[in-house]
UniProtKB/Swiss-Prot annotation:
Keyword DNA damage: yes
Name of the protein this chain belongs to: Holliday junction branch migration complex subunit RuvA
UniProt KW DNA repair keyword: yes
InterPro entries: DNA_helicase_Holl-junc_RuvA_I, NA-bd_OB-fold, RuvA, RuvA_2-like, RuvA_C, RuvA_C_sf
NCBIfam families attached to this UniProt entry: ruvA
Gene this chain is encoded by: ruvA
Length: 202
């Protein structure tokens, strides 16, 4: 399963872009609207955390700027009646913390602002989000690693590297070095820095 793509932006079409890796492989990646708006010019470097959606007739990649956004997409698409396209539309309208606020504030009607979602569907999605979304993460980020003790960022980034196939010992060593040098990184930043370090053979 593809979980991370980094490379050169080759093309943008609709809500998708083509990313060509340093190895010369091109991937079509569907991204939220706010991510599309911040893409660099063609030839610029981009990186996405990927959720791979497999259907009978297609394999599609959905890309996100942060690990939190990717995980929120997975939560959304685990809800019945919410496919990948609807999940992407929701995340084009609301960031993960916005969705958590909707849950905390019990603002079910806000979801009807998303194209294709009526009141009945919004109520269904909202009910599922109440049980599946981690509202305790709002608004502060997870605790950082300090003094070498694994904190929330360390644990989540380590889990992300494990999902990408890295061994715990190697990933833990690199993450500790990364967070020691840059203690203010969030989970996504720590993952990207660790992946770059691992790619250099560190």
């Amino acid at each position: 399963m593809i979980a991370y793509v980094e490379g050169r932006l080759a093309e943008v079409a609709g809500n998708a872009c083509v990313v060509v890796t340093d190895g010369g492989v091109g991937y079509e990646v569907f991204v939220p609207g706010h991510t599309l708006a911040r893409l660099p010019d063609k030839g610029g470097r981009v990186s996405f955390f990927i959720s791979t959606e497999v259907r009978e007739d297609a394999l599609e990649l959905y890309g996100f700027a942060t690990w939190d956004e990717r995980q929120t997409f997975i939560v959304l698409t685990s809800i019945s009646k919410v496919g990948a396209k609807t999940g992407l539309a929701i995340l084009s309208q609301f960031r993960p913390d916005d969705l958590r606020r909707l849950v905390v504030e019990d603002d079910v009607l806000a979801l009807t602002r998303v194209s294709g979602i009526g009141k009945k569907t919004a109520q269904h999605i909202f009910l599922e989000l109440k049980y599946k979304l981690k509202v305790e993460d709002l608004p502060a980020a997870a605790p950082l690693v300090t003094g070498g003790a694994p904190g929330g960022v360390f644990r989540d980034a380590l889990a992300g590297l494990a999902n990408l196939g890295y061994g715990e010992e190697e990933a833990s060593h690199v993450l500790k070095e990364v967070l020691h040098g840059e203690p203010d990184l969030d989970v996504g930043g720590a993952l990207r820095a660790a992946l770059r370090a691992l790619a250099r053979g560190r």
